[in-house]
């Protein structure tokens, strides 16, 4: 065990334990990861290493995992920099000491905003009865003797002075001061490296990080660069030259006392949900049986009963009942509050979850693999993801805090790491480049180019920069910085709930959002230690669906729910087969739209396959085309055995889901459940470490031993490799398919309600409000402009008697940019029945100038002041009437201004609302010579395959799948609809600038028609964005 490794382990007779080292979880203060520090310490022959990040234990779990692999002792601690005192390093020798440390870190963090802490010397005179303290004094300060004596009186034998030597100019003075302080206080001295680097080679990156931290540049502030690299882990011989032997030996004494290991942590889940007099297992069984009767009102099938009894037995054996009861309590609360939710992921493999109402997919609809959810051999906590409406998830989060208290519940952390854009920017600034220069360099870089790295592109485009030393450093350090932690953020919804004070287990700190707290460990850390978390996630489509249901139920006096929407409706599938899926959850991407006419879903299970098959795994594993050929009857389905047939029959002999791969390994190659799960994990990390190769022999030999042919065994392994980290679980796909079907049903039968629900739930999903409104118009939905006297805050589905149409929608004021929601809603509450009649009356409602100006620019004051120019003029002329003296002054006589023309109106529409209800901008440009002979999107179906043509449109979507090297799918929008353009790597590279940045793109290419799907293969590209000078349109870069 790493926590109790043999302390006598040494190298060349010299023994040393590093007691003060920072990892890159002391954000921007270290160039080394925890793993690198542990590995290097072991290589150097250290007896132990302490990871002592600043007011944090964020790196210790990763260090612990590495220390177990290396069999080097890990000491847990933390560093605190205290003004006018120096640096205090606190070490945890025992489990109780570790709890003390975590509680103190929590206290210090609670005093400050996210990312900071406050600690003073008085904090170290109380509350530490078990920890060890190393004090590195700031010898520039006074009163050190008094502080030292007070620390000794409190900490007694648990207190040392800490000396670190880094070959600075004042080393001798500091050494003498340390000796004098030791003699005065009569306390022992130990030594450490103050480590911020694993190796000397990390010094240049360390200097870059230091410049970033201080917001300066090494070019203009040379003092930000370190004098040497002595903050790295030094060899034992180097350390022997630095420090007295007695001080070195003291490091071992201290390390010997530190016997705490993270394996000692025990996590207890809340148990208060169990009624008095009942056991957790008995109560969970009771709830499951009640739920089974609710799910199966005609009688619970024996097969279902057998499954849930088997699951309950394993849940009891693993003591997971409180976890399931907690999830059940959360969804019960959501259901009582009318909040839509749905469990997904591996939990959909569980019949218990289905009976408890956590998941919505009937296990009879999919092939259940409970081992994918809970496995005795895996001995890891289950993962239950529950999506809630994104607008109301906060209600669930605050319910958790109310029920368990902030001492017992907090969100898991997410480590925000440097990605290319942020690394390029911060490194560039640290090297002295200006923001304008960096934007210029980065402008035409295509990070998705699989044949040319971004470095090669930069060298090619800006040789004058990259030939310089500074330019070379920009290339080098940007690459090194990518992946380095930048700060902690909150997980999207992973809650850790404890039976007792959570801060005894892990420190808790403030999140950037009010009323949120976050622990210092991320999801991976929790999994490594076997700690349970509850995933309370947000999903915009659930918000939209709840609003659609409310609209239908109110309009038609129904009690429709997601569960009572008619199933297997042929009209729904007919619409999907035509790729009419804009706005439909999970099947609205261009790739999904291209697949729909080919796969032609006719049943719910077809939809499950549809969602899973358009993924990198099936595509890379060459599973898509065989499946489509077999589905179309063009290829014979052949199974090498009945066992394989039982696994693959529903997908025509092609493994599409992750569960199928696991089952195949078990039935065809003889894998145990635990071995099959190890295979799944290797698949998940294939792109990172290639661990799949170690299963190749076992998988292939296992199949050969069972009589399968070599060709089948090798093909299956290739397919597994193709899945890589992108294999999609059937349970996950089934949960998503349920939402996809429901949203498709609304689009088919109630398009106005469908689009109103979506528009009132933005921002979410794949498409902008402009694209959704245009799609709605193509489906017969009419839109009326926003008006202060007719609109509400949200889009409204208007009564048929008001419009003589059942599909008319009034734009909501929410669509107008720059409005205050609270002030507008206050004004709407005061709106007279007949509406406002003057600008003066409107102002008295409490709106500010900015609100009235925004309404005027959006042409939403037409009923009061006329066209937008007139209304805007009146709003400006009223600015001198805000003083009390002018409170009762009537509106001035309005100067009559000319009405805007059509281009002006379109431009103002886009600037104020992001969309127009007038003609499409391309309709106004259609007679421009640049667009001469361009084919309309609606006419592409009449073209023949192989025809050369030109087309033009607004770039609304750029997609580059991670599977098909070098290909990008563009969506171009004109006044008639959308067209699909395929741009291969060579074409993208040849026309890189317009390909990456164009808003209005002209394309010359060749038509390709396959299975009713039309593409244009681009040969030439031209940027026509200049023609859009009358609008403020922006293209969408990449999804």
Curated annotation (Swiss-Prot):
UniProt keywords, alphabetically: Cytoplasm, DNA damage, DNA repair, DNA replication, DNA-directed DNA polymerase, Nucleotidyltransferase, Transferase
Gene Ontology terms, MF aspect: 3'-5' exonuclease activity; DNA-directed DNA polymerase activity; nucleic acid binding
Domain of life assignment: Bacteria
Enzyme class per UniProt: transferase
Catalysis: reaction(s): DNA(n) + a 2'-deoxyribonucleoside 5'-triphosphate = DNA(n+1) + diphosphate
Protein source organism: Idiomarina loihiensis (strain ATCC BAA-735 / DSM 15497 / L2-TR)
GO biological process: one example: DNA replication
Full protein name: Error-prone DNA polymerase
The family this protein is said to belong to: Belongs to the DNA polymerase type-C family. DnaE2 subfamily.
EC number: 2.7.7.7
Gene expressing this chain: dnaE2
Biological function: DNA polymerase involved in damage-induced mutagenesis and translesion synthesis (TLS). It is not the major replicative DNA polymerase.
InterPro entries according to UniProt: DNA_pol3_alpha_NTPase_dom, DNA_pol3_finger, DnaE2, DnaE2/DnaE/PolC, DNAPol_HHH, NA-bd_OB_tRNA, PHP_dom, Pol/His_phosphatase_N
Major localisation: cytoplasm
């Amino acid at each position: 065990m790493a926590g109790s490794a043999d302390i006598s382990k040494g190298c060349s007779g010299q023994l040393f334990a590093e007691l003060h080292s920072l990892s890159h979880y002391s954000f921007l203060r270290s160039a080394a990861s925890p793993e690198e520090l542990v590995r290097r310490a072991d290589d150097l022959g250290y007896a132990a290493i302490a990871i002592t990040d600043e007011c944090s234990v964020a790196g210790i779990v990763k260090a612990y995992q590495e220390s177990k692999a290396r069999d080097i002792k890990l000491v847990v601690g933390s560093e605190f920099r205290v003004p006018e005192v120096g640096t205090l390093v606190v070490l945890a020798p025992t489990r109780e000491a570790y709890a003390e440390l975590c509680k103190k870190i929590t206290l210090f963090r609670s005093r400050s905003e996210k990312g900071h802490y406050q600690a003073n010397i008085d904090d170290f005179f109380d509350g530490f009865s078990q920890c060890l303290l190393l004090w590195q004094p700031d010898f520039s300060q006074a009163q050190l003797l008094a502080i030292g004596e007070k620390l000794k009186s409190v900490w007694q034998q648990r207190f040392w002075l800490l000396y670190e030597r880094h070959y600075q100019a004042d080393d001798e003075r500091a050494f003498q001061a340390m000796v004098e302080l030791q003699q005065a206080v009569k306390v022992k001295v130990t030594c450490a490296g103050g480590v911020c680097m694993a190796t000397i080679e990390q010094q240049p990156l360390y200097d870059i990080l230091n410049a970033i931290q201080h917001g300066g540049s090494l070019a203009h502030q040379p003092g930000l660069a370190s004098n040497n690299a002595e903050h790295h882990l030094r060899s034992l011989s180097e350390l022997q030259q630095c420090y007295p032997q007695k001080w070195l030996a003291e490091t071992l004494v201290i390390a010997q006392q530190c016997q705490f290991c993270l394996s000692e942590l025990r996590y207890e889940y809340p148990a208060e949900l169990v009624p008095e007099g009942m056991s957790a297992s008995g109560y969970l069984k009771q709830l499951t049986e009640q739920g089974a009767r609710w799910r199966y009102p005609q009688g619970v099938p024996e097969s279902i009963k057998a499954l849930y009894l088997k699951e309950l037995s394993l849940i009891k054996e693993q003591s997971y009942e409180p976890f399931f009861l907690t999830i059940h309590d959360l969804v019960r609360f959501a259901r009582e509050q009318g909040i839509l939710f749905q469990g997904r992921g591996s939990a959909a493999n569980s019949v218990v979850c289905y009976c408890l109402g956590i998941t919505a997919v009937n296990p009879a609809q999919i092939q259940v693999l409970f081992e994918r959810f809970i496995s005795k051999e895996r001995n890891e906590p289950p993962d239950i993801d529950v999506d809630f409406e994104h607008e109301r998830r906060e209600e669930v989060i605050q319910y958790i805090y109310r029920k368990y208290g902030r001492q017992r519940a907090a969100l898991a952390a997410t480590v925000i790491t440097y990605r290319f854009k942020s690394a390029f920017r911060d490194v560039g600034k640290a090297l002295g480049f200006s923001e304008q220069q960096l934007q210029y360099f980065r402008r035409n870089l295509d990070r998705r180019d699989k044949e040319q790295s971004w470095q090669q592109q930069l060298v090619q485009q800006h040789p004058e920069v990259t030939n310089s030393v500074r330019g070379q450093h920009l290339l080098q350090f940007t690459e090194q910085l990518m992946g380095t932690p930048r700060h902690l953020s909150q997980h999207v919804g992973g809650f850790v709930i404890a039976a007792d004070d959570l801060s005894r287990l892990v420190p808790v700190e403030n999140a950037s959002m009010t009323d949120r707290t976050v622990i210092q460990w991320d999801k991976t850390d929790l999994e490594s230690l076997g700690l349970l978390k509850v995933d309370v996630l947000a999903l915009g489509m659930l918000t939209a669906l709840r609003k659609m249901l409310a609209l239908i139920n109110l309009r038609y006096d129904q009690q429709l729910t997601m569960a009572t929407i008619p199933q297997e409706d042929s009209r729904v599938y007919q619409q999907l087969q035509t790729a009419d899926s804009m706005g439909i959850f999970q099947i609205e991407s261009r790739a999904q739209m291209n697949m729909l006419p080919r796969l032609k879903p006719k049943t719910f299970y077809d939809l499950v396959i549809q969602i899973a098959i358009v993924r990198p795994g099936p595509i890379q594993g060459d599973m898509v085309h065989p499946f489509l050929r077999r589905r179309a009857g063009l290829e014979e389905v052949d199974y090498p055995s009945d066992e394989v047939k039982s696994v693959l029959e529903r997908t025509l002999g092609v493994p599409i889901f992750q569960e199928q791969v696991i089952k195949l390994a078990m039935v065809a190659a003889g894998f145990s459940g635990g071995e099959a799960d190890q295979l799944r994990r290797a698949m998940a990390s294939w792109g990172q470490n290639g661990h799949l190769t170690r299963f190749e022999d076992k998988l292939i030999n296992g199949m050969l031993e069972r009589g399968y042919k070599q060709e089948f065994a090798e093909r299956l392994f290739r397919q597994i490799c193709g899945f890589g980290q992108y294999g999609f679980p059937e349970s996950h796909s089934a949960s998503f398919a349920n939402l996809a079907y429901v949203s498709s049903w609304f689009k088919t039968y109630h398009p106005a309600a469908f689009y109103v629900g979506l528009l009132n739930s933005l921002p979410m999903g794949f498409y902008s409000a402009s694209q959704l409104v245009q799609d709605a118009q193509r489906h017969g939905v009419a839109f009326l402009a926003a008006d202060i006297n007719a609109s509400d805050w949200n889009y409204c589905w208007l009564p048929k008697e008001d419009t003589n149409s059942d599909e008319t929608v009034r734009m909501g004021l929410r669509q107008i940019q720059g409005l205050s929601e609270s002030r507008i809603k206050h004004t709407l509450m005061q709106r007279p029945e007949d509406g406002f009649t003057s600008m003066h009356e409107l102002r008295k409602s409490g709106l500010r100038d900015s609100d009235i100006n925004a309404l005027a620019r959006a042409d939403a004051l037409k009923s009061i002041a006329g066209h937008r120019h007139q209304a805007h003029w009146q709003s400006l002329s009223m600015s001198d009437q805000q003083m009390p003296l002018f409170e009762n002054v009537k509106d001035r006589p309005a100067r009559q201004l000319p009405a805007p023309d059509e281009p002006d109106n379109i431009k103002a529409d886009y600037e104020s609302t992001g969309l127009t209800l007038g003609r499409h901008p391309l309709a106004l440009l259609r007679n421009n010579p640049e667009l001469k002979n361009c084919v309309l999107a609606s006419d592409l179906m009449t073209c023949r395959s192989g025809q050369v043509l030109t087309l033009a449109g607004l770039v609304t979507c750029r997609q580059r799948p991670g599977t098909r090297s070098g290909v990008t799918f563009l969506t171009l929008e004109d006044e008639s609809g959308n067209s699909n353009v395929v741009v291969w790597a060579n074409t993208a590279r040849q026309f890189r600038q317009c390909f990456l940045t164009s808003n209005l793109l002209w394309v010359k290419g060749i038509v390709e028609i396959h299975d009713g799907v039309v593409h244009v293969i681009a040969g030439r590209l031209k940027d026509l964005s200049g023609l859009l000078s009358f609008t403020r349109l922006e293209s969408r870069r990449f999804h």
